[in-house]
Structure formats: structure tokens, C-alpha cells
């Protein structure tokens, strides 16, 4: 009897251990997103990401769909219309003085709308052909960066994007039938595609002129390969295995701009296993949430704050590209993304990274600063060609690699963009007190900005420093009225900040002459 008793106990313990492995442990909060059904459009899907890859969990028609994205999926063909003899701020100023602004719009604005690229491009989607009835719960656990979906028949899905690896995991429990995930490729072969939603969609993907990519299927593995412009390509791989009613699998999306390879990433992930990957995933998120917290008496504001901090943690990393317009959640509607999914430095990137400072997430904010620092040569070339000065300004609308894209030049090629970007170097120094960063990054960046601003501006008879023309983002759209002869508060405040900050940092470094000069 004793032997049978202990064998029974051991069996129960082993069964319990197996059950624990099936469900990944989660910690709910009052700020979690919870719904009674899956979203019906991509832009309302549950977002998961790690600043390099991301997914949106939603339902297209009646099918569960993961929209897969990666930061460095870009068509980087040059914006030829910007080049040429009139690619000069002085020419824009002259056209404004003459009251003849249509040539400016034709050169910088019209091509941005008319040409499909340069542009961010989408990755692909995963669909799961389930026939299991109605969903009754969709839950995004903020603490765990995990989405859980429950069906009325008892099926459960748990899915997460690994916090530090370019992979996403999915685990289904209690499936009544065998299920194989399917990769759904973007429709690059249809130039006449029309968006089926009310998003600010761009042109059809087919206008890029790509040959439709290839999908290869093997037992437990599917691969999608897509060629892009100029030798660029990307790959999506999904691997899975099903044992009884449990289906577990992993996907990866990689590009030719990085060393990652989707087939290798997924194979290595399957070797590690979902439990091990979830533990290392949680190591990041536990540390992330421990960095800071805010308690608000208004529950709606508390939920909004917590959700925004979750979004920041999903879109920012030290070794990632900065947060673009849609971050790692590019539109999944057969079209190019709204505003080409580019980098808007007129306020979008700046505001996206403010939580890094008071929120005690300086490490995550470094992805922004590292990219700005590494692209200085591109910015200085743009500054010499367009503004005709030394120092450094930055395009207000630019590609992954920092090249200008045109658009409404009052903000897409604004004369004060780099001043606001310089503030982030200043803030990192103030919050970190890192003197190496001050000496090697913050002051050199702001010195280049101040040098440019000094040369692009003039001092009038009253001793007041002025820009040739001034603007403020998006007021009066792209009309001639969006330019002002008097300095706007926007430009004035940015120039004041840039010179004062350059002086302060020079003084901190003991550079008295330079501090006095910028003062």
C-alpha cells in the first residue's frame, strides 16, 4: 500500500508539473487591457513588441491573425526630386518673398505624396485556421507583456514577443483538432489595392514594383522570402509542433540589414523552449516595471499612464532604431503605412522619448540617442547642401538611415529641428550625470547644433538674432502662409534653448571661452 501511495503522489506531482508548463504564469493588474472579443481591424489589435519586432493580435474576417512587423523593413530608394540646384533653403526663402510658392510645393511636397518610396514596408501575417467557436476573453497582461485569448470551448492562446530576442511565441491549449499556422504575404503584386479601413493609408504596396515573394512549406515549418528594392530582402519563418491539444510555436522576422536570420532564430528558440524564453522575457519586464511607478487618484488616468509605459517598453531599446510613426506595428491593410511610417522629428520622436527621463528608463532611451549620434555625417551633409552652413541640422521627416524625404518643408526641413533633438542629449546628461556622455556625446552634439544655428541666423540692427524665415509645425499646412517673417514662439524657444544649453555644457566642461560665446 505504501509503495502504491507514493507512486500515486509522484504521478500527481508530475502531472501538476506538466500542467504548469502548459500555461505561462501571469500577473494581472487593474490597468490591463481586457475585451470580450478580438479586434476586427489591425489598428485596434493587441500590440506586442520589443523595439525590433512586433505583432498585432486581431481577427480578420473570422480568422485569428498576427500582423508581423520589424523596424528595419524599409524601401530606401533615394528621393531624387530633392536633389538639384534648388535644393536650398535660400531658394525657398526667395520663392516666399516673391509670393511664388507652387514651385516649392512641386519640388518637395508633391513627390512625397506621389511616389511610393522611400517608405517603411510591412512584414507579413500569421493566420490560424481555427474552427472552435466564439472568443469570450482577450487580455493583455501589462506586467508580462503577454496576450491571452480564451474561447468558449475551452481553448486558450498565450502569445508574447520576447523582450530581447527577435522572436514571438504562441501556445494554444485544449485544441480539438490539428492546426497549422499559415504565413500570409503582403500583396506586392496588386498596384490597385484599396484600403478597406478608415486609416490614413498610403498607396498600394503593389506600386513599389516588387516581384511577389515566395512561400515554402515543410512539416512544422513555413518560410516566406521577399525581395525589395536595391538588393534588400527579408524573411519570415514560423516553426511549430502539436502534441495532442497543445500547439506551441515560434516566429521570427529578419531583414538583410541585420545579422539575424529567421530560420536560425526560430530553430534556436525551439531548442531553448517556450518556458526558458518566457523566463528570460520576464527578466526584462520585471526590471522594466521596477524602474519607476506612478500612483494616480484617477483610475482612467492611471490606466492610460500604465498602458503608455507598456507601449514605451515595447517600442524602445538601447540597441534599437528609434520609435517611428507606427513603431513596430506597421499597417496591415495591403497599403503603405500612414505617412510612410517614417521618422517625424517635428514632435513625434521627441514626445515619444520624454518618458525615458522622469520614468527612469535612460537605457531604453539610448536607442534614440545612439541613432542620432551615428547618423551625424548624414545630417551634416544635408545641412551643407540645403542650408549652406557648417554645423548640423536634422531633417524633420527622414528615412531609417536619416535621409530627408521632403514633404511640407515648413516642418519636414524646418530650420530648428536639431535644437529639439539636442534637448534629448541635454536631458540624458541632466538625469544621468554621466560626465563621459557629457564630454563625448551631449556637448559635441549641441555644439554642432549651435554652430549651425549661429550661421543660419543673422543679428538685426536692434541686436536681435533672427532666422530668414520661421515656422511652427503644421500651422497653415503646406501653404505659403505657414512661413513667417517674425520668429514664431516655436523657433524662438528652440533657439534660446540650444544656445543656453551649449553654453551650460561648455561651462560644465571648463570651456570658458566657448561657454561665453554661446551665451
Q: Each predicted region: which residue ranges?
A:
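Bacterial Sec-dependent N-terminal signal peptides
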Residues: 1-25
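Acidic/polar, glycine-enriched structural segments that form the non-catalytic walls/loops
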Residues: 19-44, 48-342, 361-366, 372-381, ...
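Beta-strand segments within the central parallel beta-sheet cores of soluble alpha/beta enzyme folds
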Residues: 28, 32, 325, 367-370, ...
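A conserved hydrophobic secondary-structure block that centers on an alpha-helix together
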Residues: 152-167, 178, 187, 415, ...
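Extended, well-ordered alpha-helical scaffold segments
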Residues: 300, 304-307, 364-375, 437-453, ...
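Alpha-helical support elements that line or immediately flank enzyme active sites
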Residues: 311-314, 349-363, 419, 425-435
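The feature captures the catalytic groove of carbohydrate-active enzymes
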Residues: 327-342, 390-440, 454-518
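Active-site cradle of extracellular carbohydrate-active enzymes
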Residues: 369-372, 376-404
